[in-house]
Amino acid sequence: IRGAVAQNTTAPAYPQIKGYFSVLHPIATLDQDTVVYNFVDSYTVLVPVGLNLLKSDHIGFSFELAPTIKVENGQDRVTSLLFHPGILFRRNHGVTFATRLAFETNGRYGITPIFNQVVVKRTDVSYFVAGSLPARFGNNKPGTIGIAVQLGVNF
């Protein structure tokens, strides 16, 4: 048949395991009385690394660990380690909505909704940007909600 071309459109096999590495910058955190901005009196950065177990094109489970590093008055230190498991709701065009539980070694806990967008996709690697709204409670401190931006690589 003229114009007919055979196509090999094999669907990806699931489950799949993917890893990632990223850098997360908190922008601001709001508690009952104040807004604390990153980069003003101190600088805080998180370095999330994790594994995603993808069940299908639409859903997966993620296991993440993220050390928190704070630089203040010329001193830097790791202030906590975040255990951040969650469910991934994958959409079309590289968009993912993640719902994560948060357990920090400093005694805080909470939830983190995350909107993630793949911005560059290659055969073996993709680069993403994400925005998150972490809500934290516990450790005899007022509840907080923040906003953060994350840049990373999936492999």
Residue ranges and their predicted role:
Residues I1-R2:
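Bacterial N-terminal signal peptides
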Residues V5-L54, G146, Q150-N154:
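Short glycine/proline- and aromatic-enriched beta-strand/turn motifs that initiate or cap beta-hairpins
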Residues Q7-K18, L53-I59, G94, V120-Y127, ...:
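Short loop/turn motifs that connect adjacent beta-strands in outer-membrane beta-barrel proteins
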Residues Q7-N8, Y14-L24, T79-E104, L151-F155:
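Glycine/serine-rich loop-strand microenvironments at binding/catalytic pocket rims
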Residues F21-T34, G60-V71, G94-N106, S126-F137:
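Transmembrane beta-strand segments that form the barrel wall of outer-membrane beta-barrel proteins
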Residues T34-Y43, V71-T79, R100-T112, R136-G146:
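Solvent-exposed loop/turn segments connecting transmembrane beta-strands
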Residues V45-K55, T79-R91, Y109-V129, I145-F155:
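Feature captures outer-membrane beta-barrel proteins of Gram-negative bacteria and organelles
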Residues D57-H93:
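Mid-chain, structured segments of secreted extracytoplasmic proteins
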